[in-house]
């Protein structure tokens, strides 16, 4: 374990060009973080040395770009201890990740009378998509009651989750209160009634080790920009068997093996439809990987 004295004495500002060059005390990290030099340099390095379209071409630069793309997924897989890199979906942010689950999984699996359980402290990105999906499917949104201090008890979770519950959606850490919520209990309660658990880790991933296998979350979402990475990159983790069964959220290139004029003979590859439609800004993936390693090293040092 790294002691508090060592953590406090380290000059963290030198890693961040904006902070090192200015007399600034930046305290808005829950909204977005400043970027360390390694992230900025990785972005610049990509444009200088590797810029090409991944997953398509067979020439050297395209192959390098593809390697960078796939290496980024492996890096995130290791960061959250997913079973496979195929369980890592790159999105634009946590909001898009949660909407992907709500609209792809939710619309396909909810029916009238089903219940979606969440909390009143959720970020709107983990509340409004469920309300909108409930309106379209006839499902009902229920809220786990919070105590006056903002805490959530095991009893409150048990009272909210019933045999009608199909989805339990909860933030691991509240973006308003900063509270660490009992997601282990929420996930366990969901699985006891056959529901899936959706975890918003936007505020927890930057500050604590995430182990999706240990927590047994079905889906988990977070953003790069809240954990020293670039804006425009988010992550959705989903258990492979759930992703394989979900209909496409968006459609486009690299998600289909062939297509006919009338569409009747088209062959959609479901897993590919999530992580290969269109192109994420590859340079952001490159810098996000650098950030991922930077953040991972810090968390590992603190844990050790």
Where is each model-derived feature located?
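Pyridoxal 5′-phosphate
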Residues: 1-304
